């Protein structure tokens, strides 16, 4: 997840400095396109949960919790829930930044609530990925350094630019990136520009694709993180 100040910087840098050079599919305001993509970036960032899990293991917090009479899934579940609450604050700040630069949710309150719910669900699922990797890495410093590897996942997507202008091989990767599906779903539900007229299945059916990715991440990483916590 981005830090609380990062959305402001990204909106300024990409929205005002680079925005005039980027065209949106079907026309429309680039800043509206960008803000919806940044919502997806916030939801997909696993770095805070990864670093927190590694820090807890390094400092012996995991050992202390395991000595308590609680289920082994309670601690990672609590961390995932806490990260989700922090994410709500990030979404709120992102919305305020967006409103300040002209972004609007054009399809009404119900669809906007659906968009936020989808973003929160994906973030909850992504948090489990971070928890598992943090426990696997085991050292806070190493986890912080490994966070640089997460950056390309965001860049190889449609968050900042449409994938149509990418080379064919790179576009395939970007189109099937879960972050691209989530960003496209946010744009669709918020009523923002940028929905492609043709392309890969996840971008033509972004809400369904985002729900599928969310379910897949939970199915894979909840048991992995729980077992790793029990053995940490």
What is the role of each PLM region?
Residues 1-30, 232:
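Hydrophobic alpha-helical transmembrane segments
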Residues 6-15, 30-101, 154:
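Hydrophobic alpha-helical transmembrane segments of multi-pass membrane transport proteins
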Residues 14-23, 101-106, 135-139, 161-165, ...:
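Short helix-capping/hinge motifs at transmembrane helix termini and TM-loop junctions
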Residues 72-147, 205-223:
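Alpha-helical transmembrane segments and their short interhelical loops
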Residues 161-205:
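Terminal transmembrane helical anchor/hairpin motif
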